[in-house]
Amino acid sequence: MANQKVAPLADRVVVKPLEEAEQMRGGLYIPDTAKEKPQQGTVVAVGPGRFEKETRVPMDVKVGDKILYGKYSGTEVTIEGEALLILRESDVLAVIN
């Protein structure tokens, strides 16, 4: 699993984006060029937090949280065939309960 292979630094979070539907409700298939980037996913790894005045600030998100993030946030990476997104905690807009 990716969380054992990736150890984010500082206030970074590794997210597995939600898979998009390949097919619309009406049965039509959506080409890759027409698909929108996902804006939610599951946290698979969390950094230790950022430093502020020589004190480490703990992270607000944890592994397993479902989150919403900005459409163009983070850096897309592929690790062992798994598509992941590395973003800063400040790019996380909300945690989905």
From Swiss-Prot:
Keyword Secreted: no
Alphabetized UniProt keyword annotations: Chaperone, Cytoplasm
Pfam families: Cpn10 (PF00166)
SMART domains linked to this entry: Cpn10 (SM00883)
Family matches, as InterPro entries: Chaperonin_GroES, Chaperonin_GroES_sf, Chaprnonin_Cpn10_CS, GroES-like_sf
SUPFAM superfamilies in the cross-refs: GroES-like
GO cellular component: cytoplasm
Biological process according to GO: chaperone cofactor-dependent protein refolding
Subcellular location: Cytoplasm
Record-level Gene Ontology MF annotations: ATP binding; metal ion binding; protein folding chaperone; protein-folding chaperone binding; unfolded protein binding
Subunit structure: Heptamer of 7 subunits arranged in a ring. Interacts with the chaperonin GroEL.
Annotated family: Belongs to the GroES chaperonin family.
Function: Together with the chaperonin GroEL, plays an essential role in assisting protein folding. The GroEL-GroES system forms a nano-cage that allows encapsulation of the non-native substrate proteins and provides a physical environment optimized to promote and accelerate protein folding. GroES binds to the apical surface of the GroEL ring, thereby capping the opening of the GroEL channel.
Record-linked NCBIfam families: PRK00364.2-2, PRK00364.2-4
Protein name per UniProt: Co-chaperonin GroES
Native organism: Gemmatimonas aurantiaca (strain DSM 14586 / JCM 11422 / NBRC 100505 / T-27)
Taxonomic lineage from the root: Bacteria, Pseudomonadati, Gemmatimonadota, Gemmatimonadia, Gemmatimonadales
Gene: groES
